[in-house]
Amino acid sequence: MDTKVIQIGDRKIGGGNPIAIQSMTNTKTEDVKATVEQILRLEKAGCEIIRCTVPTLEAAAAIREIKKQIHIPLVADIHFDYRMALAAIENGADKIRINPGNIGSTERVKAVVDAAKERNIPIRVGVNSGSLEKPLIEKYGGVTAEGIVESALDKVHMIEDLGYDNLVISIKSSDVLMCVKAHELLAGKTVYPLHVGITESGTVNSGNIKSAIGLSLILSQGIGDTIRVSLTGDPVEEIKSAKLILRTLGLRKGGIEVVSCPTCGRTQINLIDLATRVEKLVEDYPLDIKVAVMGCVVNGPGEAKEADLGVAGGIGEGLLIKHGEIIKKLPEDQLLPALKEELDHWS
């Protein structure tokens, strides 16, 4: 889907730019030290845009100091009180996220739009299924994809009527199929970049599955310019999942893909532990390769040869395979160090 280019800090989204990975801090924003520490961890994991909640003037004031210590654009998340938006903009937020429907009167929305316009920072218009207006619920006989889209476009038109079009849209639902349908409907009705995610998707286990299904169905249609995998847990897990989803869909390169067999009665090494340790090992390598971890000598060598680098287990030992060729036979406890050495000197 062709969308217009929007600048968020030093990051461009839309218009064919790479899909940006976002997350949101779960610290108290006014706790600058804790918030910065978390953002730096997220940056290291691959986060490209960060959102922070701004429920108080203290949180808004903290944005100025936080931005001095981080390296990615910061989005201020605003609900209900338009003064928080004004303060966040004043303190250097790179983008603000609002739902004009809960900000208050048109005059208050205009004040926010005017402040954003003065600094030329984008506004993300966010609508969730849980905040759908009663008239739209009555019109469509419940919370529906059609109602979510109409709500979002109404708010976009409100801001356009105030003379501003530096906008991003997000429409979210915890209902995966409703969320997918809403994005399909919206994509044909707007040129603004879309921030995509399944809201309130759950814990790392359930949330990853729901997000992978929903985001894949949306992104595979060419819809979406930024994404967030919303999880109940450490936000760093959101980044890991988002990167894997994009890589799996062929929308992003870089980062090592680990494949491993599901184990069976033929498994001859502690494969579950080894595969887990390999996944942890490769997190910080920027290599665009595939690493295979296989548990037995029946299928292991053949399947590992399809990867760039791999191990195939035997009884207390294993084979190290590179570019399809067996290069070493090692005791089990030496497989991981040998794998690391190959990665450190990859060619």
Which residues are covered by each model-predicted region?
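Alpha-helix-loop-beta-strand connector modules within alpha/beta enzyme cores
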Residues: 57-78, 111-123, 183-194, 278-280
